[in-house]
Design a protein with these regions (language model features):
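Alpha/beta-hydrolase active-site loop
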Residues: 149-173
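N-terminal secretory signal peptides
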Residues: 1-29
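Cap/lid segment of the alpha/beta-hydrolase catalytic domain
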Residues: 108, 134-157, 265-270
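Short beta-strand/loop motif that positions the catalytic acidic residue
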Residues: 227-229
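N-terminal export signals
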Residues: 27-52
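Primarily recognizes the serine-hydrolase "nucleophile elbow" in alpha/beta-hydrolase
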Residues: 164-222
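Short beta-strand element of the alpha/beta-hydrolase
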Residues: 97-106
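N-terminal cap/lid segment of alpha/beta-hydrolase-fold proteins
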Residues: 55-94
Length: 295
């Protein structure tokens, strides 16, 4: 990232990036509107460089980390996109079956950041699978703009089936103990909410700033929920009060946290929306939750 100070950037700039990252405005409009904030020493180029993901620089667990066995596999999703590619990660030296975690990507396919996240989740003692919903269209193209464009062409219900099929694959894996949870970010958070409603034997669900599921389906939820929201994420948070009311009325097991003064995407350490304090706290809560529910 550049040497721009995050605290010097107006909230409107982060909101503008959120609009762009979620396809509410195109790249041309994003650049045009961003120019309004290019004053003094700030240029559009420097702001763009500051806001865009730095995947290479943020990798924490490399693909060849000796503590993990990470490999690409394929599985079948007959109700979804057919053959789906995924990253499967297992701690080396595992002597007993482990709890499983399905890691669901954002709205741009299985990019390097989510692969890294999947490896991070495996290290504490889980077997993880991170499917790529873009597989039927050739897979993550190596560019987020193209990834978002490709993902917008897929049917969300079919993509949901792809992740449910990934759950089924993991649940019956020889190194899994049969207890499987799901964690998702942004689009993936909405999938985690939907899986809580549609997968009867799901052991745990952790949506990070994910859109809420249909309220009328809340009675179907059996999995315990741990929900992470960002205070400044007004778009996603708008649906939370009604969702929480339904969870309470139906006596569902859930814990929700709204992290103060942070943006949508606060866990993503490849962009300046990242907030280390909130991300670390949410991460530890998530690991503790999975350790409790997937043992």
């Amino acid at each position: 990232m550049s040497e721009i100070n995050k605290d010097d950037i107006k909230q409107e700039v982060f909101d503008l990036y959120d609009d762009y990252a979620h396809d509410r405005i195109d790249r041309r409009t994003f650049v045009q509107k961003l120019s309004i904030y290019a004053v003094g020493t700030l240029t559009v180029t420097s702001l763009m460089s500051f806001l865009m993901p730095d995947y290479k620089g943020a990798i924490q667990i490399k693909a060849d980390d000796p503590k993990l066995k990470s490999e690409y596999i394929t599985y079948q999703s007959p109700k979804g996109g057919g053959t789906i590619k995924a990253l499967l990660s297992i701690p080396v030296g595992t002597k007993k079956p482990l709890g499983g975690i399905v890691v669901v990507h954002e709205n741009r396919g299985l990019n390097p950041h989510i692969e890294d996240i999947a490896r991070r989740f495996a290290l504490p003692g889980f077997i993880t699978i991170a499917p790529d919903a873009l597989t039927p269209l050739g897979g993550y193209p190596g560019n987020d703009d193209q990834g978002r464009e490709l993902q917008s062409k897929r049917d969300k219900k079919e993509m949901l089936e792809d992740f449910i099929a990934g759950y089924d694959y993991l649940k019956t894996h020889k190194d899994c103990n049969g207890k499987v949870g799901v964690v998702g970010f942004c689009f993936g958070g909405s999938i985690a909410n939907l899986m809580a409603e549609q997968v009867a034997d799901l052991s745990a669900s952790v949506p990070y700033y994910g859109g809420q599921p249909p309220i009328e389906d809340v009675p179907k939820i059996k999995a315990p929920l741990l929900l992470h929201y960002a205070e400044l994420d007004t778009r996603v948070n708008e649906g939370w009060p009604a969702y929480e009311t339904a969870l309470k009325e139906n006596k569902k097991e859930y814990t929700a946290y709204i992290y103060p003064k942070v943006n949508h995407g606060f866990n993503n350490d490849t962009t300046p929306r990242y907030d280390k304090a909130a991300a670390d706290l949410a991460w530890q809560r998530t690991i503790d939750f999975f350790k409790q529910k997937l043992k």
